[in-house]
Amino acid sequence: MNEDTEQLDIISDFRTFEKSSYDKWNTLYQNIKEDRKFIAGDQNDKVDKKLIGDNVTECRLNVVSNAIRTIVNTYLPNQYKWQYENQQDLTTRADEFLADIDNSTAAVEALQNAIGTGLGVLVFSNDLDIDGNVKSCLYSINDVTNVRLDPVATKLNFADAKRAAIIELKPKEWVEETYGVGSFMEKPLIDIQDNYDHKQYMPLVTYYLKRNNQVYVFRMLGAEIVEQITLPYSYIPVVP
């Protein structure tokens, strides 16, 4: 299989996956969008607003946000730990990893999403520390509706997932400046089911694919794969 054919195979695989994932999780994602507005304080419908009147300043206690904050505060003194039986060295390293301020913050952010809207997503990745050294890190996806989860995974932590994707809508000017990919396409080959402004944006897709017990990640844009990395994992590092 030549490189062009292989790229088209990966892109086709993503398109099939993205549609099936969107179809399965779309109802949840639409509910999450409504819940987020409610949590943010948009809690009055048209009838409520008409009864309140235009000249009345709304002043109310956001019970939902306070309840979420209370549950999170209850969790903080009892944070999740990894423990390995008869492997104290691994347990110590896991404690150090989760105690890192960035990683612990990510865990709390995912918890807030899970409590508030029913879904939080964590991603294992790598980053550079202040000395320029590569370190493992954990980060939370702020807008979980931009995540595509494996629709056929059966385990609670999605440990058996074969695919996942993270979608970022990027301005077309940024696309051209950063990747040199032509932004003239009205309908890019690498696209998503969700609605967005095709004239202004293009989806930048980070696609995780597990084949033969090896995990690959592809950065895709427009009609091409702009980056490909083989990950040192045996699992998809996108964890709901």
Language-model features: where?
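Extended, helix-rich architectural segments
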Residues: 1-203, 210-215
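Extended, charged amphipathic alpha-helical segments
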Residues: 207-240
